[in-house]
Design a protein with these regions (language model features):
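Nucleotide-activated donor-binding/catalytic signature segment of Leloir-type glycosyltransferases, i.e.
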Residues: 225-247
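N-terminal strand-loop element at the rim of the active site
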Residues: 2, 7-15, 22-73, 81-82, ...
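Membrane-proximal helix-turn-helix segments that form the acceptor-binding/catalytic region
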Residues: 121-143, 150, 156-157
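Acidic donor-binding loop of glycosyltransferase active sites
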Residues: 253-267, 280-281
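Acidic anion/phosphate-binding donor-loop and adjacent secondary structure
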Residues: 125, 152-155, 166-184
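Conserved donor-binding/catalytic core segment of Leloir-type glycosyltransferases
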Residues: 178-207, 216
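Short acidic/histidine- and often glycine-rich active-site loop of Leloir-type glycosyltransferases
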Residues: 287-293
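Carbohydrate-associated surface elements
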Residues: 42, 149, 168
Length: 293
């Protein structure tokens, strides 16, 4: 049995692809008998008993997204204290050069370290670190990329060798045989609101569909209110806000189509994988990250 520390740079109480991977991996490792703990920022109560919170996050712009990082000194001190106290056999750092807990752990070098690189596109901190301090990535004992696009970005700025291991999901959670799609004509969109996610494009296309079609939008974030006001006249649209994982799985089981209309910068389509696991027909943009699925 190993004591495994899994560190997330992103707030674990805010939904996101990296966060879901971190928590899901910890659950699976614990089922295998390992003592896995997750360290990361939390904006509220930790989502699992095995999570050690490292303080609140700060919204930070990256790759057309707003990501919840914790680059402040207090988070660094909590990270140092937690790693010292836990005496992990191995550390698994997700986005190891993202400002915050993962960089702190990388600099401490208190255990063998695996780094998993998720991002694709254009990430500001890669460019900054490449100018003199990219050597910190050499502290990693192994490097993983979740897709060829993530590998390309990391290698471009950091060099090194990477093993590609695609993201996974806990597929049994998405099997809902007791729910029937029936005659549903509902299109389902789920994800935080960012322009690159293509929700505005989906709404423009939806206006052209027949009156008996529905659109379920599970999304929140800055800018969603403007879209909601613009399409307030269309009563076929249900604005659900942020929903729980349980409700997401229910709607994936009921919808006629799951739509992932992202415009760019998708490293891997976890949400597409979830929809497929639930048996939902998927319409997605022709992006490399989605084709990996």
């Amino acid at each position: 049995m190993l004591r495994i520390g899994i560190i997330s740079p992103y707030s674990l109480t805010i939904p996101g692809g990296v966060q879901s991977q971190v928590l899901g991996l910890a659950r699976e490792l614990r089922k295998m008998g390992h003592e896995a703990r997750v360290l990361g920022p939390c904006d509220g109560p930790p989502p699992e008993p095995f999570v050690t919170p490292l303080g609140n996050s700060l919204p930070t712009a990256a790759n057309g997204s707003i990501v919840p990082l914790a680059p402040d000194p207090s988070a660094a001190l909590r990270t140092i204290r937690a790693i010292n106290d836990e005496a992990f056999d191995v550390l698994h750092l997700h986005e190891p050069i993202a400002p915050g807990p993962t960089v702190t752990a990388l600099l401490l070098r208190l255990a063998p370290m695996i780094g998993t690189f998720h991002a694709a596109g254009d990430i500001a901190w890669y460019g900054r670190l490449s100018k003199g301090v990219n050597w910190i990535a050499d502290f990693l004992d192994a490097r993983i990329a979740v897709s060829p696009q993530a590998q390309e970005l990391a290698h471009r700025y950091l060099g090194g060798e990477y093993e590609i291991l695609f993201n996974g999901i806990e597929s049994d959670l998405y099997l809902r045989p007791e729910i029937s799609r029936g005659e549903s004509k509902a299109i389902f969109f789920c994800g935080r609101y960012e322009p690159r996610k293509g929700l505005a494009t989906l709404l423009e296309a939806f206006e052209k569909l027949s009156d008996d079609t529905e659109l379920w939008i599970a999304s929140d974030g800055e800018g969603i209110a403007d879209l909601k006001a613009k399409y307030a006249h269309d009563h076929r649209i249900s604005w659900l806000g942020r929903i729980t994982d349980a409700e997401k799985i229910d709607r994936l089981a009921k919808c006629a189509v799951f739509c992932a209309p992202s415009l760019h910068s998708e490293s891997f389509g976890i949400v597409v994988l979830e929809a497929m696991a639930a048996g939902a027909p998927v319409v997605a943009s022709s992006l490399e990250g989605y084709r990996n699925v």
